[in-house]
Structures are given as structure tokens and as C-alpha cells.
Regions:
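N-terminal carbohydrate-binding/catalytic regions of secreted carbohydrate-active enzymes
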Residues: 24-119
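Receiver (REC) domain switch/active-site residues of two-component response regulators
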Residues: 55, 183-184
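Generic detector of short, locally flexible boundary/turn motifs and exposed helical patches
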Residues: 17-23, 88-89, 150-152
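Short low-complexity stretches enriched in small and charged residues
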Residues: 9-13, 42-45, 77-80, 140-144
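N-terminal low-complexity, Pro/Thr/Ser-rich intrinsically disordered segments
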Residues: 2-31
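Active-site cleft segment of glycoside hydrolase catalytic domains centered on the general acid/base Glu
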Residues: 101-183
């Protein structure tokens, strides 16, 4: 559904919402954005769906493919906009993250994201409590902490922890929480 207006409902006033002071956390309100990977591509002539600015542009990276750059059109859109870049960094084989042989890949990817000079939220290993990432909370936590430590070396980057709230009953998302110091 292509809608240009949305309604947002809150309990109470936005200025009364709890504020934790985390990196890139809005003082009140929310960030609204789109996954920009499917929002047209100037190289293949596909049309732009959304013709106005958003506060957040999201573009997926695939760790297992050793992808180091944003997909198009995000690689065109993000530099042009006054926005936050949100990067869902998916991983299937958590052991790839733990393997120090891939540390240079992680650093190269983060360096590439830093070149956009935008506030950036890295959403690593999302929905870990369902599917293929749900088999080892210990390995997931270790990998998340490794990524978070590397992300926190960048002054305008933050880390998002994003479980699936409908996870399996035998894999509650609390088992995967890496700790407050790793999550912004």
C-alpha cells in the first residue's frame, strides 16, 4: 500500500515519554523512514515510489555475502538527504562474525558506511530469536558484542538490538540480550 500519510497514536504526550539518552535516540517522538532499496534506481530507470524526504533511509547488508556497500538506490539517496542511515546487517552463519579472519571485512564495511557522513544505526542480526540465529544465544551475544564494540568506534554510529516479539515460546528474546552497554 502506497500511502503518503500515516497516523501515529501514543499513550500520553511525546514530551512525557521516557528518554534514556542513548546515542541517536530522539528526545521525543519517533524516527519515520523507508527501506530505500526498492525506491527506484537511476541506473535501470525504475521509477521512484516516494518523492519526499524521510528521516531514516534503510538499506540491507548481507554479512554472509560479504557485502560492503549499500545497495542502489540507497547509495545515491543517503548522501543527498538530511537523514539517518539505518543499516539492517543480516547474518545467517554467526560463526562468520566470530572468525577473526573476517574482522577486516567488518572494518571495511563500517568504514564505507562512515563515508556517507550520516548518523548511522547498525541493526545487526535482527530477529535473532527465530529461525536460523535462534540456535545459540551464547554465540549470538558474543557476535553482537563484537560488532557493537567495532561500531562504537565511530562517533556518529549507534547499535540497534531488534528481536522478533513473536518469537518461539522456547526461545524468548531475553536469552539473546547482549547487555545495556552494547545496545544504544
Amino acid at each position: 500500500v502506497n500511502q503518503t500519510e500515516i497516523d501515529i497514536y501514543t499513550e500520553g504526550k511525546p514530551e512525557e515519554a521516557t528518554y534514556y539518552g542513548a546515542k541517536l535516540e530522539p528526545r521525543s517522538g519517533i524516527y519515520a523512514g523507508i527501506v530505500s532499496d526498492g525506491n527506484g534506481n537511476p541506473e535501470d530507470g525504475s521509477p521512484e515510489t516516494f518523492h519526499h524526504d524521510f528521516g531514516v533511509y534503510s538499506s540491507y547488508l548481507e554479512f554472509d555475502d560479504f557485502q560492503t556497500q549499500l545497495n542502489k538506490p540507497s547509495s545515491y539517496i543517503v548522501p543527498e538527504k538530511n537523514c539517518i542511515s539505518q543499516v539492517p546487517w543480516n547474518v545467517v552463519d554467526i560463526n562468520l562474525v566470530l572468525d577473526s579472519a573476517n574482522d577486516e571485512y567488518i572494518k571495511e564495511t563500517l568504514d564505507n558506511m562512515a563515508k556517507y557522513n550520516k548518523p548511522t544505526i547498525i541493526r545487526f542480526g535482527a530477529e535473532m530469536n527465530i529461525g536460523y540465529l535462534g540456535d545459540s544465544p551464547t554465540a549470538y551475544i558474543k557476535a553482537f558484542r563484537k560488532i557493537a564494540d567495532m561500531v562504537h568506534e565511530y562517533p556518529n554510529f549507534a547499535v540497534m538490538w531488534s528481536p522478533n516479539d513473536n518469537g518461539s515460546l522456547d526461545r524468548p528474546f531475553g536469552y539473546f540480550y547482549p547487555g545495556d552497554e552494547y545496545v544504544d
